[in-house]
Curated annotation (Swiss-Prot):
Pyrrolidone carboxylic acid (Glu): residues carrying this PTM: E173
Name this polypeptide is given: Pro-opiomelanocortin
Main location: secreted
Coiled-coil stretches: none
Factors inducing expression: Repressed by treatment with estradiol.
A Pfam family per the record: Op_neuropeptide
Highest rank taxon of the organism: Eukaryota
Organism for this UniProt entry: Ovis aries
Gene expressing this chain: POMC
A GO molecular function held by the record: hormone activity
InterPro entries recorded: Mcrtin_ACTH_cent, Melanocortin_N, Opioid_neuropept, PMOC, POMC-derived_peptides
Modification after translation (UniProt): Specific enzymatic cleavages at paired basic residues yield the different active peptides.
Length: 263
């Protein structure tokens, strides 16, 4: 009877061990050692036969398990499934995934740890070789200054010297004189008359401007600056003389009505 209880307890222990494992292979229970579980020796033999399978499914390091070497390189672990992963792509659902992010990180580390002189005379990295970022696409990126104008190169040396010696206005006058000389005396007379008219117009405008400055300011460029008197206030504030024909008309109508009633 005690042997039967011990065998039952052993079988129960074996069943619990088999259920605790992640996956149990079929050959362990179908082996000849696990067919007869009535005796304690057969039970222990079955447990020993199934123990390697259990340890392969759920590996446990007895004792100093923390000191055992890791199967995976911890540097390969990158949180590529998070959007703030700095080594992975922005889209976590990309074809590479976390593996591509880890590979990218390893490449960056390999580039940083590659052979090359270091110290005070170290070579500048690829990031240091890049030009400093200047916000040229913004209007406030660079200080506002005078725009560079293209330098005009003349084929003749005389024209270049004249451009440096005379300012733009004198240069225009010189070109105008050359054209007049090429046209003839009639064109010169016409241009002289046009110049005289232009000068007269400029003098007249200057005198008119002086008169305006001396007098009171009037908003003549607006339509309400100085309206005529008969159109002020919508034509209601007019003189009494303009209303006399209307008054006489009303008087005549009233007199006619009175005569008709009296008859």
């Amino acid at each position: 009877m005690p042997r039967l209880c011990s065998s039952r307890s052993g079988a129960l222990l074996l069943v619990l061990l088999l259920q605790a494992s992640m996956e149990v292979r079929g050959w362990c229970l179908e082996s000849s050692q696990c067919q007869d579980l009535t005796t304690e020796s057969n039970l222990l033999a079955c447990i020993r036969a199934c123990k390697p399978d259990l340890s392969a499914e759920t590996p446990v390091f007895p004792g100093n398990g923390d000191e055992q070497p890791l199967t995976e390189n911890p540097r390969k672990y990158v949180m590529g499934h998070f959007r703030w992963d700095r080594f992975g792509r922005r889209n976590g659902s990309s074809s590479f995934g976390a593996g591509g992010a880890a590979q990218k990180r390893e490449e960056e580390v390999a580039v940083g740890e590659g052979p090359g002189p270091r110290g005070d005379g170290a070579e500048t990295g690829p990031r240091e070789d890049k030009r400093s970022y200047s916000m040229e696409h913004f209007r406030w990126g660079k200080p506002v200054g005078k725009k560079r104008r293209p330098v005009k190169v003349y084929p003749n040396g005389a024209e270049d010297e004249s451009a440096q010696a005379f300012p733009l206005e004198f240069k225009r006058e010189l070109t105008g004189e050359r054209l007049e000389q090429a046209r003839g005396p009639e064109a010169q007379a016409e241009s002289a008359a046009a110049r005289a008219e232009l000068e007269y117009g400029l003098v007249a405008e200057a005198e008119a401007a002086e008169k305006k400055d001396s007098g009171p300011y009037k908003m003549e460029h607006f339509r309400w600056g100085s309206p005529p008197k008969d159109k002020r206030y919508g034509g209601f504030m007019t003189s009494e003389k303009s209303q006399t024909p209307l008054v006489t008309l009303f008087k005549n109508a009233i007199i006619k009505n009175a005569h008709k009633k009296g008859q």
